[in-house]
């Protein structure tokens, strides 16, 4: 995870710059400059992966709520889905974004878990700095899945879209390519991206270390739901660790569901030419908000289907990882064109790490397919 941080930062910053400089999202920019069949294929895979992710997240929250408070999981799933959809549709962006920012603090539950369990920190340090990856299909599939959760197309779409939302409610709502004083905005994007991706990487490492030091170390490797993971922690690390993990699942789900549904709506709306934006009223962006509601509903439906949510989550991450490489390459090309970015074309370091990130994702995907 530490070694992928520069690629994560580069890709998210490229996404943010495209949105803020052009005033168009990732799908909207691809629609204007890329072949339509490529755009439709990318968006179709994004929608499928997002809906499966929504189902896994809603199902995870429901199972944890059942563990903590009792009651049928499907009732909790419906309640969480309804709450997330209603809040995202009816709360204005400028207020809603504050809710999401404060909710990221819930992710610290996974970091707190490390302080209540035993961790062999020397072994962790060696493994982090010198990671070992077995060159077989199973290992490379998991590598693509892990990369697909951190360098993921839905995050590209969301990052660019939120830059546009912020721009439209700012004192000067013009895209940067129409302004000559964009240096401060670029610096702000740079600082925000490094801070956000650093925080994301910290939480991801905490989850990996925490589960490896407890569940995997005690032979618990077949987990069907996050609630089972929380329950399995109790006899190993105590009830407090179980509670912390459970609260982390709830907080993560409440943060992830709106982002997944929102990125689905942004991508589809930009592709179809619909009005979009969380600052718009529901009646002014019907297709956009209908997509949010439908994606969340379909995700909740997975909870009562025979689909194994954890396996589905892994394969959704694999899809994200496989799609990410071509999308990153397209973003680097577009971000390097003066006809698209004006005076704000990507600097060399972003292009280098952008191409490096694309190569990493493609190489892992090809290795997964051919070995």
Describe the function of each predicted region:
Residues 1-33, 42-52:
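Juxtamembrane transmembrane-helix boundary signature
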Residues 121-127, 134-142, 320, 329-333, ...:
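A generic transmembrane alpha-helix motif of multi-pass inner-membrane proteins
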């Amino acid at each position: 995870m530490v070694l992928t941080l520069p690629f994560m930062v580069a890709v998210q910053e490229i996404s943010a710059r495209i949105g803020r400089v052009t005033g168009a999202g990732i799908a909207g920019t691809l629609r204007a400059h890329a072949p339509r069949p490529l755009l439709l294929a990318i968006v179709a895979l994004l929608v499928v992966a997002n809906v499966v992710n929504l189902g896994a997240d809603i199902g995870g929250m429901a199972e944890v709520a059942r563990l903590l408070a009792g009651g049928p999981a499907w009732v909790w799933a419906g309640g969480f889905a309804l709450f997330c959809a209603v809040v995202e549709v009816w709360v204005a962006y400028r207020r809603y974004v504050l809710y999401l920012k404060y909710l990221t603090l819930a992710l610290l539950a996974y970091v707190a878990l490390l302080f209540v369990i035993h961790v062999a920190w020397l072994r962790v340090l060696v493994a982090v700095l010198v990671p070992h990856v077995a060159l077989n299909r199973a290992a490379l599939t998991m590598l693509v899945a892990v990369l697909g959760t951190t360098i993921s197309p839905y995050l590209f779409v969301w990052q660019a879209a939120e830059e546009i939302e912020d721009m439209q409610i700012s004192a000067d709502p013009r895209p940067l390519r129409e302004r000559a004083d964009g240096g401060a905005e670029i610096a702000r994007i740079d600082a925000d991206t490094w801070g956000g991706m650093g925080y994301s990487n910290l939480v991801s490492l905490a989850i990996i270390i925490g589960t490896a030091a407890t569940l995997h170390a005690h032979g618990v490797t077949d987990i069907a739901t996050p609630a089972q993971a929380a329950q399995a922690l109790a006899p190993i690390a105590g009830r407090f660790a179980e509670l912390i993990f459970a609260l982390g699942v709830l907080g993560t789900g409440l943060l992830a569901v709106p982002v997944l549904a929102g990125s689905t709506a942004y991508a589809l709306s930009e592709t179809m030419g619909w009005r979009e934006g969380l600052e718009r009223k529901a009646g002014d962006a019907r297709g956009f908000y209908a997509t949010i509601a439908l994606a969340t509903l379909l995700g909740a439906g997975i909870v009562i289907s025979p689909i194994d949510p954890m396996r589905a989550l892994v394969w959704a991450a694999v899809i994200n990882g496989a799609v990410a490489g071509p999308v990153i390459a397209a973003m680097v090309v577009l971000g390097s064109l003066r006809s698209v970015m004006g005076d704000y074309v990507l600097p060399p370091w972003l292009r280098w790490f952008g191409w490096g990130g694309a190569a990493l994702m493609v190489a892992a995907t090809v290795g997964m397919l051919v070995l």
